[in-house]
Amino acid sequence: MKIVFNALSARLGGGQTYLINLFEFVPANEDLEILVFAPTTLKLPDHPRVRRVEPAWPTENPIVRALWEKWVLPSILKAEKADVLFCPGGVVGTRAPVGCKVVTMFRNMIPFDLRVRKSIPFGLQRLRNWLLNRIMLKSMSEADLTIFISNYARSVIESLTKVKNAVTIPHGIGSVFRTHGGSTVRPDYLPESEYVLYVSRFDVYKHHYEVVSAYGKLSQELREKFPLILVGETNLPEAERVKSLVSTLGLEGQVLLLGAIPYQSLPPLYHHAYLNLFASSCENCPNILLEALASGRPMICSNIMPMPEFGADAALYFSPFDSDDIGNILSEALSSPDLLRKLSAAAIAQSDKFDWENTSRKTWFELLALAERPKQGV
């Protein structure tokens, strides 16, 4: 049995994190062989059944990669007698040979969120998302199996096209984020006081602007007691807009933009937060929300799906489009220690439902089950 991974598009953290965890739990099947096309930055396990294959083409270029997937990969699949081609990036640009089944995955929600797409200025990025919408729909409608990572995302796609065979397998939470009940060293760059934490890249649909506006409406007493810490790259246009708002509202010293923090350094920030906040309105599986819950600290969160699907009763919810609503929920949370204790306990219980080992085993089960189906046309 041979499964080929086309993971050449997995160049950023989220896509690589998924694959690293998946390969950590490779099944014990002796007849299983796994071939992986992936960037050299993706560290693969030293496993006898996992083999990295380097394309002869310079596939770092997305156009060259698309041509390689269309013209070269089919012949490789045929020569290797592959049973399954898995494209976790969500785009299938390869016509698999007879007998080789195709699996894709839906992770990128932006091409299917019209509000977000309209917020992107006219140009290549806007065109790219328009094209991705159509290419991904085609990929999912033609695949032998589509893996969804939230029921909400599945409902969106199934309202737009017929999916032959689908399964929902949410992402897990890395053990490094499960700091509740333990202790972590408090980073020196954190304020000595309690703080409210929001970790996310700066973009319009992350609603930092509305969050800062809401924070500015809190009482001076609450603002002095609980500074707002924003973690994310600050060299983006939306970050500049937020910086300008902080200055206009006179919140310097109370709203702190720490910039980008390495992924592995985030757990102590969640762990030491008095309150975690997540205000995104466009997600597929909100990893930041899950990782924050795993710290056992209380959470207030966007009420836009799929956030309630993952947060359940472990968060207080607000409309990310309404700074007054955000402010009211923020004030309620910061003024109610008993409520926060309940949310903290609920966060621990909810986060325990999401585990990378469970995610990986379910995924391998589906891949192997598909591979074992009788081949058609041979």
Give names to the regions the model predicted.
Residues 74-75, 125-146:
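Membrane-proximal helix-turn-helix segments that form the acceptor-binding/catalytic region
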Residues 294, 298-301:
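Short hydrophobic beta-strand element within catalytic cores of glycosyltransferases
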Residues 316-324, 332-337:
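Conserved acidic donor-binding segment of nucleotide-sugar-dependent glycosyltransferases
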